[in-house]
Amino acid sequence: MDPRGTKRGAEKTEVAEPRNKLPRPAPSLPTDPALYSGPFPFYRRPSELGCFSLDAQRQYHGDARALRYYSPPPTNGPGPNFDLRDGYPDRYQPRDEEVQERLDHLLCWLLEHRGRLEGGPGWLAEAIVTWRGHLTKLLTTPYERQEGWQLAASRFQGTLYLSEVETPNARAQRLARPPLLRELMYMGYKFEQYMCADKPGSSPDPSGEVNTNVAFCSVLRSRLGSHPLLFSGEVDCTDPQAPSTQPPTCYVELKTSKEMHSPGQWRSFYRHKLLKWWAQSFLPGVPNVVAGFRNPDGFVSSLKTFPTMKMFEYVRNDRDGWNPSVCMNFCAAFLSFAQSTVVQDDPRLVHLFSWEPGGPVTVSVHQDAPYAFLPIWYVEAMTQDLPSPPKTPSPK
């Protein structure tokens, strides 16, 4: 959807100015695309380990109750005529972006399933746990020219946890978000309401409230190079008519974008927006992005499907385009950098990785507040020597 300012907001936390810094030499990691143009690294086909839902009050449920079903308009009928402004602001309940959720919902799922993880309990000790949105930012970093980021990292029982921190600049932009941008964010969610049904075979109901607290999240296992990954990401809907109903290949990502009317506009779209769409969908193995193109009045009159594995073809011959190998190689390099930097096993010790466009990734070290992000309830529960439930069969 376009833009997703709040959607991944669940994965951020706001902090004050750095304090409690611990003296330590600060290594760095360059981000120049030319340094990462080697062959595409190994990336294990993502497999879904489970899922969870967040309800209208943002409460966690370890099930698929919030999953919606892809229900596009008939291809043989009149084209769509979706009014993306309908219901704004009267039927809009946006999530409170001041609430610092960090990794908490994913950690709830981990606590529920720690004894039944594919690969056994030893696998988690070697893994990196994070949100899909954080990995997406890493993938796009070599080509990003505007927005920096900060990632807090802590090691606990061997596992490396990564949680995004809202930068001061990002916070300032969010608090000063102009009305037009707030409306554009609503329009992206409204598009989902036009394209999704609550039950298989039923029709969408765009007359209801748009509540961005509600979310369905997939939890996935993968591996990039030598780095086992356990990450979660929000899923827009599942396609009951997909060739395979096995997650994540049945999932569909929904986006909106303004109509394009010139080759230059399309070229810019392929270079910038399509890169982010590719990174967001490639990581969890979502095969298709369905885009609704809106006119200046906020109506969607055309849809286009972008297969994730074919997105690179739009920029393959563009010297100013992006390269998937560069994205994945940089991400792998960052994960190696983080693994070798965060050595001490201490949930209250935080290495803060910071990056601004044009520079390298730098590191600072902090103890406890404001950067520590692993909650006490999670640390205590994982520390207790409780018997593990029986394993469930490993998903293929």
UniProtKB/Swiss-Prot annotation:
Keywords attached to this entry: Exonuclease, Hydrolase, Magnesium, Metal-binding, Nuclease, Nucleotide-binding, Nucleus, Phosphoprotein, RNA-binding
Recorded GO MF terms: 5'-3' exonuclease activity; magnesium ion binding; mRNA 5'-diphosphatase activity; mRNA binding; nucleotide binding; RNA NAD+-cap (NAD+-forming) hydrolase activity
Family matches, as InterPro entries: RAI1, RAI1-like_fam
Compartments it resides in: Nucleus
Region (Disordered): 1-37
Claim: rRNA processing is one of the keywords in the record: no
Tissue distribution: Ubiquitously expressed.
Basic and acidic residues bias locations: 1-20
Residues modified to Phosphothreonine: T392
Main location (coarse class): nucleus
Cofactor entry: Mg(2+)
GO biological process, one term: nuclear-transcribed mRNA catabolic process
Binding site for substrate: R58, E101, W131, R132, G133, C217, E234, K255, Q280
Residue positions, PTM Phosphoserine: S394
GO cellular component: cytosol; nucleoplasm; nucleus; plasma membrane
Chain positions recorded as Mg(2+) 2 binding sites: E192, E234, D236
Resulting phenotype, D236A: Abolishes the decapping activity on incomplete m7G cap mRNAs
Residues involved in Mg(2+) 1 binding: E192, D236, E253, L254
Free-text remark on how the cofactor is bound: Binds 2 magnesium ions.
Catalytic activity entry: a 5'-end triphospho-ribonucleoside in mRNA + H2O = a 5'-end phospho-ribonucleoside in mRNA + diphosphate + H(+); a 5'-end NAD(+)-phospho-ribonucleoside in mRNA + H2O = a 5'-end phospho-ribonucleoside in mRNA + NAD(+) + H(+); a 5'-end NAD(+)-phospho-ribonucleoside in snoRNA + H2O = a 5'-end phospho-ribonucleoside in snoRNA + NAD(+) + H(+); a 5'-end (N(7)-methyl 5'-triphosphoguanosine)-ribonucleoside-ribonucleotide in mRNA + H2O = a (N(7)-methyl 5'-triphosphoguanosine)-nucleoside + a 5'-end phospho-ribonucleoside in mRNA + H(+)
Function, in words: Decapping enzyme for NAD-capped RNAs: specifically hydrolyzes the nicotinamide adenine dinucleotide (NAD) cap from a subset of RNAs by removing the entire NAD moiety from the 5'-end of an NAD-capped RNA. The NAD-cap is present at the 5'-end of some RNAs and snoRNAs. In contrast to the canonical 5'-end N7 methylguanosine (m7G) cap, the NAD cap promotes mRNA decay. Preferentially acts on NAD-capped transcripts in response to environmental stress.
UniProt protein name: Decapping and exoribonuclease protein
Gene name of this polypeptide: DXO
